[in-house]
Design a protein with these regions (language model features):
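Intrinsically disordered, low-complexity, positively biased terminal segments
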Residues: 1-141
Length: 141
């Protein structure tokens, strides 16, 4: 048996295994610690995502229903809306967590289908404001 251990950055930079329909090798990602957004509106306020154009997030969160729904990001503030004319980015809270906290890039999440939009260019200004390195969770007990 051959074992190759890659730096975590390789796993997130090129989602090779996720794109293969039937991989001939087994790739195992050993989770260390996990993060989860439990208040998307508060997180976006802290991140100060002041983008020039309004965009919308359509978030699914089955575990925390208050955290899911449709939101508009306008002037650095995320507000819940019923409907919107703004370009929409949709996906689960896990994918939004990975993107907004810098674990995965938007392009990678779009490529694997974890996030979906018809207008990816509209979300590049948001992506440009985000941290470009993986988060470090130093408290482990």
């Amino acid at each position: 048996m051959f074992t190759y251990e890659a730096p975590t950055a390789d796993v997130t930079a090129v989602p090779v295994v996720q794109l293969m329909t039937e991989p001939k090798y087994q790739a195992v990602v050993k989770p260390y610690m996990q993060a989860r957004i439990v208040n998307l509106e508060a997180l976006c306020q802290v991140l100060e995502l002041d983008v020039p154009e309004t965009v919308a997030f359509d978030v699914q969160d089955e575990t925390a229903p208050w955290n899911g729904g449709r939101f508009e990001l306008r002037g650095g503030t995320l507000e819940r809306v019923v409907q919107t004319e703004a370009p929409q980015l949709s996906g689960g809270i896990q994918a939004f967590t990975q993107w907004l906290l810098g674990y995965k890039r938007l392009s990678s999440l779009l490529l694997t289908g974890e996030l979906r939009t018809n207008t990816p260019a509209d979300f590049e200004p948001v992506d440009a404001l985000l941290t470009r390195q993986q988060p470090v969770l130093a408290d482990y007990f």
